[in-house]
Design a protein with these regions (language model features):
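Long, charged amphipathic helices and adjacent flexible linkers at domain junctions
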Residues: 106-115, 201-212, 245-269, 426
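Active-site neighborhood of HAD-like aspartate-dependent phosphohydrolases
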Residues: 47, 206-256
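A conserved regulatory-domain signal marking ACT and ACT-like small-molecule sensing domains
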Residues: 18-211
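Short glycine/serine/threonine-rich phosphate/pyrophosphate-binding segments
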Residues: 39, 132, 222-225, 377-380
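Short, Lys/Arg-enriched N-terminal segments with co-localized hydrophobic residues
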Residues: 1-19
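C-terminal cap/substrate-recognition subdomain and adjoining C-terminal extension
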Residues: 268-427
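Conserved active-site and cofactor/substrate-binding residues in soluble primary-metabolism enzymes
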Residues: 34, 38, 77, 81, ...
């Protein structure tokens, strides 16, 4: 390279630049320096004046520092004049500029790569660290994929960690086909455990940007408790019911059988206890924000729960939820009989209901999202376009394609590709 210095600015000119042809040249320019209004306009006006064709362009601003790349074609055999003008304008703007000629063969090869598979990798954590970025980047490279773009989804991070509940999310856009997807998933899971983060790997398709229906489990997902355990404590059978619940969540007991066993233990409990529990449900971190934004952007929302309709309807009123399907407890003379009414909403039924609601709402199954924490949520998680295990048991987390374990339920927004910069300002 020939290096030309102008006070604080410089330009790198490849040696072959002096031997370039003067017709239909393809040139890549990279500009970096302090960002301020008018830099991009001033440089692109030079290209416009010379009737250049823009073949690719990208710009990023990190901490008020500009990084701009433009790939253009000179069609009038005057690339020397264009580069000269750009050079002096960059000096005037106090930015650094670098030129690289691109051969037709190099350009054609680049164009041919556009058919490669594209994926989105999303990182969630309480704090973003260099180890996290390095770890994800290493795994991507080992799978022979290339990172095209990296952007921060969460807002600017304050130095005062006590200012708010911290969360950080970064999105990678990558291109290529993984050599071994199962191995990659295992590596991501291992890394997420070691570095306290969540890693989502999704195909970058139009459906990812057009989700329209989201279905939630209720207990230990929308709320930070298992309602049946709360009822059992009031009935004096807390330990017995909790043991059955935990075994069912781990997939060790058939859900329907565990449900019948637990309901039977609640026989004789006064229904007034249900209202008391409903009014004091511990809402999961991030639910208020998530529900507000989902309704704002037009999502249909459903609760598909192995819990009870009484509590699902309470949340339905609180958050304007569209559908609630759960289990109905039988009541006689103001007390629970220990039986239930109707079919049990188990894992199979949840998947059926997701399909049914999608059909009613005219939503493609690939436009759906399912979120849950237990083994009986896996059927709906597995068929949804985006299935998420939330603070789930190890077996569920290992089976689900995506999981969230480090931050609140509003982490789903980042898996959907939303950015804080335009969410919170408009909500």
């Amino acid at each position: 390279y020939n290096i030309l210095f102008f006070d604080n600015s410089y330009v790198l000119l490849p040696n072959r630049m002096t031997n370039m042809a003067q017709n239909d040249e393809i040139i890549l320019i990279n500009i970096n320096g302090a960002d301020r209004p008018g830099v991009t306009a001033a440089l692109t006006e030079i290209l416009a004046k010379n009737n250049a064709v823009i073949l690719d362009i990208g710009q990023a601003d990190i901490h008020n520092h500009l990084s701009l790349g433009i790939l253009f074609q000179s069609t009038e055999g005057n690339s020397g004049d264009i580069l000269k003008e750009l050079l002096f304008k960059s000096y005037e703007l106090d930015v650094n500029i670098r030129f690289n000629p691109i051969t037709e063969q190099e350009y054609s090869k680049w164009v041919g790569m556009q058919g490669k598979n594209r994926y989105i990798i999303t990182i969630l954590s309480r704090k973003l660290t260099a180890k996290q970025i390095a770890g994800v980047s290493r795994i991507v490279a080992e799978q022979d994929m290339n990172i095209d773009d990296i952007k921060r989804l969460t807002g600017r991070i304050p130095l005062d960690e006590n200012a708010r509940t911290p969360k950080a999310s970064v999105e990678f856009s990558v291109r290529g086909t993984p050599k071994n997807k199962e191995c990659m998933k295992a590596e991501f899971m291992k890394l997420s455990t070691e570095l306290e983060m969540d890693i989502s790997f999704q195909e970058d398709s139009m459906y990812r940007r057009m989700r329209r229906l989201i279905c939630f489990d209720m207990d230990s997902t929308l709320i930070e408790t298992e309602v049946i355990d709360e009822l059992a404590i009031r009935a004096g059978v807390g330990d017995q019911v909790k043991a059955i619940t935990e075994a069912a969540m781990r997939g060790e007991i058939d859900f329907c059988e565990s449900f019948r066993q637990r309901c039977a233990l609640l026989k004789g409990l006064d229904v007034s206890v249900m209202q008391e529990i409903a009014e004091n449900l511990p809402i999961t971190e991030g639910v208020d924000r998530l529900m507000r934004i989902l309704k704002k952007v037009g999502f249909k929302i459903a609760i598909l729960s192995g819990g009870f309709t009484y509590f699902g309807n309470f949340l339905k009123q609180k958050y304007n939820i569209d559908y609630v399907y759960a289990n109905e407890l039988e009541i006689e003379n103001g007390k629970l009989t220990g039986n239930h009414v109707g079919d049990i909403v188990d894992g199979k039924r949840k998947a059926e209901l997701l399909r049914l609601i999608a059909q009613v709402e005219n939503v493609d199954i690939r436009q759906t999202v399912a979120v849950g924490d237990g083994a009986n949520d896996l059927p709906m998680i597995s068929i949804a376009g985006l299935g998420i295990a939330f603070h789930a048991k190890p077996k569920v987390k290992a089976t689900a394609k995506q999981s969230i374990s480090t931050i609140g339920l509003d982490g789903i927004l980042y898996f959907l590709g939303y950015k804080d910069s335009y969410l919170d300002e408009q909500m």
